[in-house]
Amino acid sequence: MRNKILKKSKSILPGLFICLIIGIIAEFLGKSFPTIGAATFAIFMGIFLGNTLFKSDKYDEGTKFSEKDLLNYSIVLMGASLNIIDIMALGFNGVFYIAILMTLTICTTYFIGRKLGFGEKYSLLMSAGNAVCGSSAIGSVSPVIKAKDSDKVIAITIVNVTGTILMILLPLITSILYNNDVLQSSALMGGILQSVGQVIGSAKFIGDPVVELATVFKIIRIIFLVVVVLVFAKIEVNEENKEEIAHHHKPTHKVRIPWFIIGFFIICILNSIGIIPGILGRTFKWISSNFEIIALAGIGMRVKIGDLVKEGPKAMLYGGLVGVCQIIFALSLINIFIK
């Protein structure tokens, strides 16, 4: 048993070490160029190095551990940065705005993906990534819908690139349409952008009050992650049971929630009721953020340039169309609910 663990650890270390180095460099570059962000640097450095200097199979176990296990741990610890009480801060209209916007984003993203000829599971991954919280949402949904690794890595890459573009674009829109009004600007950025880092980076163009309130809107979306995973898990189970019934078998599949989603929910509840001390919560948040960047480096290293060239242009069109739809939906809903 001990020898097996040592052997497994040795096989993981080379790839994990490269992902760690990429993550450290990406964090440094992200602070130097906050408009781009560490996540985008990590993914693209990973893609470049994984297809040039570090193509060897000896890095596979480490990159697989980074992109799967570290992302799962990141999702669990992310719960410490959330507080269910934040929902009350926005009131009914704010929560209703987020719920409707997320629903429209999921349905529209899935519809566009299928119309463009993408597979059902890739379209579901894009739906979750754009509607909820980018890489973490895709990582959460991927196992419950049994998505292919190639779909997962392409979806994460496209969602992060689209988010980076929107991060620059949204402050321009808010300045033109809302004259940088705090509430409306926060609702637009917090309701659309995929990651917390993108929300903060975009909101900083306007000011600290927008950073704080946009983050609250974003947190509500992340809290809804559990609901999205449950719904997607139910969809997958229904599809599997339909196949069994079609072959005259008794349906045997049940909804199974990944352990890290349960962990995320438990940590979120513990943080909301004040059991997790502030310093521990901040530590969890720091670890979660760094694990995610290392995971994104691993995801980048596992992207094959051939797959990216093959799917890239159409996938970027997909991401662009979804981004435009999100902006239209958000502007319309803000006009109704956020005044």
Curated annotation (Swiss-Prot):
Main location: membrane
Protein origin, superkingdom: Bacteria
CC per GO annotation: plasma membrane
Membrane topology: Multi-pass membrane protein
Keyword entries, A-Z: Cell membrane, Membrane, Transmembrane, Transmembrane helix
Compartment(s) where it occurs, according to its Swiss-Prot or TrEMBL record: Cell membrane
Transmembrane segments: 12-30, 35-54, 90-112, 122-144, 156-178, 210-232, 259-281, 316-338
Keyword Cell membrane: yes
Pfam families (alphabetical): Cons_hypoth698
Family, similarity comment: Belongs to the UPF0324 family.
The protein's name in its UniProt record: UPF0324 membrane protein CPE0129
Species classification: Bacteria, Bacillati, Bacillota, Clostridia, Eubacteriales
